[in-house]
């Protein structure tokens, strides 16, 4: 599945291929690293390309637009949700950090991120943008995402969260027979 988002600020192209190797290129090194990490643990590959057409801020538009495009491509890939497990969760320790992530692909966007992150940037990525990235991804993928991360090293907390989110998504999209809802429909 692919999605292209072009605004005055950014150009983002996402092409998702299950089981392939991910090629990620963004102008923000830490964002590139986190998207590669998320896709690897989700069992997804393909291509994510982002460019900043004009510099307006600290990367906010690039980070947000990558999450929007990735969420829309995921929504297309998941389809009508009639044959997926729907729920997935994972716990990931990474040195001092520990992250839990849970995903519901029931079609209702919601997000919770509980992680104390300092107001600093790592590799051009302002850490206060992480909850916004999750919100944008959840909204466009029509998913509920809960992430809880703790630890001393903020890099490790955010990376463990991306690993856990990828693993949770991999579980949620695993094959299932029939619609996973007592209502009989996921919309």
Curated annotation (Swiss-Prot):
It catalyses: D-erythro-1-(imidazol-4-yl)glycerol 3-phosphate = 3-(imidazol-4-yl)-2-oxopropyl phosphate + H2O. One of its GO terms (molecular function) is imidazoleglycerol-phosphate dehydratase activity. The keyword Lipoprotein does not apply. One of its GO terms (cellular component) is cytoplasm. GO terms for biological process: L-histidine biosynthetic process. InterPro entries: IGPD_sf, ImidazoleglycerolP_deHydtase, ImidazoleglycerP_deHydtase_CS, Ribosomal_Su5_D2-typ_SF. Pathway: Amino-acid biosynthesis; L-histidine biosynthesis; L-histidine from 5-phospho-alpha-D-ribose 1-diphosphate: step 6/9. Pfam families: IGPD (PF00475). It comes from the Archaea. Keywords: Amino-acid biosynthesis, Cytoplasm, Histidine biosynthesis, Lyase. SUPFAM superfamilies: Ribosomal protein S5 domain 2-like (SSF54211). It is found in: Cytoplasm. Its EC number is 4.2.1.19. Belongs to the imidazoleglycerol-phosphate dehydratase family. This is Imidazoleglycerol-phosphate dehydratase. The lineage of its organism: Archaea, Thermoproteota, Thermoprotei, Thermoproteales, Thermoproteaceae.
């Amino acid at each position: 599945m692919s999605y292209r988002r072009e605004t005055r600020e950014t150009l983002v192209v996402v092409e998702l291929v299950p089981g392939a190797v991910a090629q990620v290129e963004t102008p923000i090194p830490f964002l590139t690293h986190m998207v590669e990490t998320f896709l690897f643990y989700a069992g997804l590959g393909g291509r994510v390309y982002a460019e900043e057409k004009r510099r307006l801020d600290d990367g906010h538009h690039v980070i947000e637009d990558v999450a929007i495009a990735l969420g829309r491509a995921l929504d297309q890939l998941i389809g009508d949700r009639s044959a997926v497990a729907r729920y997935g969760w994972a716990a990931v320790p990474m040195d001092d950090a520990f992250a839990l992530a849970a995903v519901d692909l029931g079609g209702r966007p919601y997000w919770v991120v509980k992680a104390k992150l300092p107001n600093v940037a790592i590799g051009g990525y302002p850490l206060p943008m992480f909850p916004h990235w999750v919100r944008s991804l959840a909204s466009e993928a029509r998913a509920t995402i809960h992430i809880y991360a703790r630890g001393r090293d903020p890099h490790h907390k955010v990376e463990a969260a991306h690993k856990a989110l990828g693993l949770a998504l991999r579980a949620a999209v695993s094959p299932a027979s029939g619609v996973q809802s007592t209502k009989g429909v996921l919309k």
